Amino acid sequence: PFTYGFTTDGDLVEPDNAEMLALAKNFGTQTLLHLSTLTEQGNFSAQRAEAMLNDPQIQSRLIEQTVRVMQEKGFSGVDVDFEYLGRDLAESYAAFLTELAQAVHKAGGILMAAVAPKTSDDQPGTLYEGHDYAAIGRAADQVLLMTYEWGYTYGPPMAVAPVNAVRRVVEYAVGRIAPEKLLLGFPNYAYDWTLPYEAGLTRAVVIVNETTP
């Protein structure tokens, strides 16, 4: 309900968030425009990211529309969450964040970027390879470490955010990004598994703390 997506032509896809923004304003809460590669089906699309990142005109259109909506709706800045980009898009993604940050700053906002929970520069996997911690840290004002989802719906029973795993991510991150820029992601949910767990069959039920403000 809160994510802004975009088309392959670089046009911003806006959610129906008027009620949520009004509520935030009533409570004096600052808001960020959340920009992601999520599709209408709820999946992250590397194809949409690639089309935008490799075309300067499409990229400029998306940046212009994002900043305009940020100003029109009173957002304090932009929060970017592009996932599963792969190694080939890492450099162009960081360059996009740099361009977006310049436009956002000119309009008086801040830029935040979410990054996958890496523990090394060369960590394999499309989720990790598209995020260059050092380059993203230089571009963004704040960087959110997505330190959660080790335990997930179709995986084996385990903590969503194991302390030892989170610690390894933080130790790596502070060596690549200025510590004062870092934010630690903390899950407001858990999973309930049916036991015994059967790989490929067991599906955990998500438990959400809906009373948390």
Task: Say what each PLM segment does.
Residues 7, 35-53, 78-89, 115-120, ...:
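Aromatic-lined carbohydrate-binding surfaces of glycoside hydrolases
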Residues 1-65:
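Glycan-recognition patch characteristic of GH18 chitinases/ENGases
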Residues 8-18, 90-212:
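Substrate-binding surface in catalytic domains of secreted glycosidases
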Residues 32, 67-71, 210-213:
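Append "and occasionally in soluble cytosolic enzymes with long acidic Gly/Pro-rich linkers
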Residues 61-92, 142-156:
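Active-site groove signature of glycoside hydrolases
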Residues 55-72, 125-134:
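Short, acidic/polar
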Residues 22, 68, 102:
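Surface-exposed charge patches
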